Amino acid sequence: MKNKLIGVWDYTVLITYLGFCSGIAGIIFALVNNPHTNEKWSFIIPLFCLMFCGLCDTFDGVVARTKKGRTKNEKRFGSQIDSLSDMVCFGVLPAVIGFRIGLKQPTWIILLVFYCLMALTRLAWFNVEEIEKEVNEALAAAENQKSRNDNENLEENPALTEEAAATVDPREKRRKFYHGLPVTNVAWIFPLVFCFKPFLGVYFGFLYAAALFVVGVLFVVKFKIKKLNAKQAVPVIILCALIFAGLVTLSVVLQLKW
């Protein structure tokens, strides 16, 4: 059946699809007025969707790499679908949340579009870097193979083969740093920003707008930031979720106005 469909349909992209669905659900919750739901849940639920998207993005690559023998097209598809999903989850969703909380004037609309454009630019450039990285790795592997073939002592020293092969191991080529702020970081940035909402009241929109602008600029400014692995990223997202959930609970108990 899957051979009759375009795309990849196996567990390697399942988490990416799950995160994408969460992002779409968050957008819908933010846009739809439900008369049976308290107003504050119209952005609290989308924020939890945003954090769930962050968790999915943390693990999608880990899960994908568990499948051995993936073709180049499968790997490329995974990379492309991840970026497209990130645009929805970490580009469009935060902007829609901003629209929901009141950033609806023409000036604010320009800001929301600016934020989405910066996210789009960053993700497109990331894809360019990944393609360049793949080409460089292929050239290095070809050069390494040529060196092995030209080495007269290769058969007498099998350890040399292992050492040469290790130099092109993709796991050794994984990036350790990003240039600019990764879009996935908004999974914890904006929920933390929302922690100030009960205390700022009608002025919170200005804080959220400022956060959108600063984060958007950081998407494209060239500075080095360490890449967090799953073990490092998950505690950060969970901690932010707990802080946000605790504040929501506290606001309900104290009847703080959101």
Regions found by a protein language model. Name each.
Residues 13-17, 66-126, 194:
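Multi-pass membrane catalytic core of lipid/isoprenoid biosynthesis enzymes
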Residues 61-74, 132-137:
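Membrane-helix interface/capping segments
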Residues 135-258:
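C-terminal membrane-associated helical module and adjoining short loops/tails
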Residues 1-61, 218-258:
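Topogenic membrane-insertion module of multi-pass membrane proteins
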Residues 25-47, 88, 94-113, 193-207, ...:
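Helix-coil boundary and interhelical linker segments in multi-pass alpha-helical membrane proteins
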Residues 57, 116-129, 213-226:
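Transmembrane alpha-helical segments that form the membrane-embedded catalytic/substrate-channel core
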Residues 6-14, 76-84, 173-180, 228-231:
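Short, amphipathic, aromatic/basic-enriched membrane-interface segments that mark the entry/exit
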Residues 11, 15-21, 49-52, 88-91, ...:
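Lipid-exposed faces of alpha-helical membrane segments in multi-pass integral membrane proteins
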